Amino acid sequence: MELEGLKFLGIGLSVVGMLGAAIGVSNIFSMMLNGIARNPESEEKLKKYVYAGAALTEAMGLFSFVLALLLIFVA
């Protein structure tokens, strides 16, 4: 396999990182809604942790996207 083909294979595999971020964020928010439904008074406590966790999870997807762009345009 040529180097160009391996480059595009790596770009395609970077989708796995973005898929993981999407699944992670959906799990975080579904668990938040589940927790609020069980205990409505915990909403304010949960929100700060949920937003921090979602931001970190989404950052991994963005890093994967940036890596794919670097592979496309730089490598």
Swiss-Prot record:
A cellular-component GO term for this protein: plasma membrane
Keywords: ATP synthesis, Cell inner membrane, Cell membrane, CF(0), Hydrogen ion transport, Ion transport, Lipid-binding, Membrane, Transmembrane, Transmembrane helix, Transport
InterPro entries: ATP_synth_F0_csu, ATP_synth_F0_csu_sf, ATPase_proteolipid_c-like_dom, F/V-ATP_Csub_sf
Membrane topology category: Multi-pass membrane protein
A Pfam family it matches: ATP-synt_C
Protein localization: Cell inner membrane
Family designation: Belongs to the ATPase C chain family.
Protein name as it appears in the record: ATP synthase subunit c
Organism of derivation: Neorickettsia sennetsu (strain ATCC VR-367 / Miyayama)
